[in-house]
Amino acid sequence: MVKNVTVIGGGLAGSEAAWQLAKRGIEVELYEMRPKKTTPAHETANFAELVCTNSMRSNQLSNAVGLLKEEMRQLDSLIMKAADETAVPAGGALAVDRDKFSSVVTQTLKDLPNVHVHEEEITKIPKDGITIIATGPLTSDTLAEQIKDFCGTDSLHFFDAAAPIVAASSIDRDIVYKKSRYDKGEAAYLNCPMTKEEFFNFYKNLVSAETATLHGFEDKNVFEGCMPIEVMAKRGEKTMLFGPLKPVGLEDPKTGKTPYAVVQLRQDNAASTMYNIVGFQTHLKYGEQKRVFSMIPGLENAKFVRYGKMHRNTYIASPEVLNANYEARKQAGLFFAGQMTGVEGYVESAGSGLIAGINAARETVGEETLVFPKSTALGSMAHYITTTSAKHFQPMNASYALLPKLDYKVRNKQERHLEISKRALKDLETFKEEKKLD
């Protein structure tokens, strides 16, 4: 019996899948086309490079992605190990030093004797053996065409964007102040307060700023969770005040009052030499980013280490293509994982790779593949992307809306979410014992 599996793609999902396979004694042939062939969004040759934000969002069990993280920790996730090991201060969220994070993942996999890394592009879907395709939303054109033909449907797409990063040394510390919203967790964010006059001056310049040309870009194709700040601003002059510029819970210690608007800066590396502008994904031209974002109090003389940018993301019509074990319906032994399946977010992508890796390993040794319980965050994501309406299919983050309701009432929303999380972790533990998952 063949005891090796091919994993195509060394992103979050592919890296997690390779880890889950390798720890079960499977020989892994891991293909990653970088650095020989790169993408519009990647900057390094490392596995699991974070191309958008450095935040993995909430770390709280009263939040769906916090639950997802804990489930993955219970299943010995490499991505969660690396994230916890390279975490930087972020209040109640989990943010990482992006370079250290990807380096830990890369080195861990390369050190495993049964993971064989191939730096080359795969242009055809293997017809034999067991394969996991986790090439991400920036799959090379040649393979993307193969996947499109295999799926028998037009590939779907949306546009994703990354926020700018500024040098810590260029931030005016006399203006900004350190605080987390509602003083939750440690004071992890630098806050740039705006008066009403400063906000509306910034708003007018932002909505009139020139954007870079991107073929096929339309507002309707922007994923809501990573919307460019200029697109958000154009939806209404006060829209940003309910989004990334929300001032609630961020009183200025100098005045004791809540500013009209607040722009937050989050630490981007462990050395605290870089900060990203939270929620400021953008597709403005670089010169316009410098001009407009330097209007933010405290960033008048900011040095931009990286400007924001936008790229096209592609995903497959999973409801028509996949089973809830992430295996293709029309080819046994072929699995898909990551953002290309329609799960949206770093942690969600890694979670799909975790399931695909476990199932590919089980199929390799002749065991039944697993469908995780719908009452878990992992299972609810797999269930959603494979059973929802294909016609209206859109990328989806982890959400309590995907999980079954409690069979008893809990009025307080946070307490209700905690109860759902407790049930999920209990069900996962039972599932692990029944299926002998280590």
Swiss-Prot record:
Cofactor(s) of this protein: FAD
EC number of the protein: 2.1.1.74
Range of residues in the leader sequence: none
EC class name: transferase
PROSITE patterns for this protein: GIDA_2
One biological process term in Gene Ontology: tRNA wobble uridine modification
Location relative to the cell: Cytoplasm
Main location (coarse class): cytoplasm
Entry keywords, A to Z: Cytoplasm, FAD, Flavoprotein, Methyltransferase, NAD, NADP, Transferase, tRNA processing
Reactions this protein catalyses: uridine(54) in tRNA + (6R)-5,10-methylene-5,6,7,8-tetrahydrofolate + NADH + H(+) = 5-methyluridine(54) in tRNA + (6S)-5,6,7,8-tetrahydrofolate + NAD(+); uridine(54) in tRNA + (6R)-5,10-methylene-5,6,7,8-tetrahydrofolate + NADPH + H(+) = 5-methyluridine(54) in tRNA + (6S)-5,6,7,8-tetrahydrofolate + NADP(+)
Positions annotated to bind FAD: G9, G10, G11, L12, A13, G14
Single Gene Ontology MF annotation: flavin adenine dinucleotide binding
RNA-binding is among the record's keywords: no
Entry GO CC: cytosol
Family note: Belongs to the MnmG family. TrmFO subfamily.
Entry-linked HAMAP family: TrmFO
Its biological purpose: Catalyzes the folate-dependent formation of 5-methyl-uridine at position 54 (M-5-U54) in all tRNAs.
Descriptive protein name: Methylenetetrahydrofolate--tRNA-(uracil-5-)-methyltransferase TrmFO
Species per Swiss-Prot/TrEMBL record: Lactobacillus gasseri (strain ATCC 33323 / DSM 20243 / BCRC 14619 / CIP 102991 / JCM 1131 / KCTC 3163 / NCIMB 11718 / NCTC 13722 / AM63)
Lineage: Bacteria, Bacillati, Bacillota, Bacilli, Lactobacillales
Gene designation: trmFO
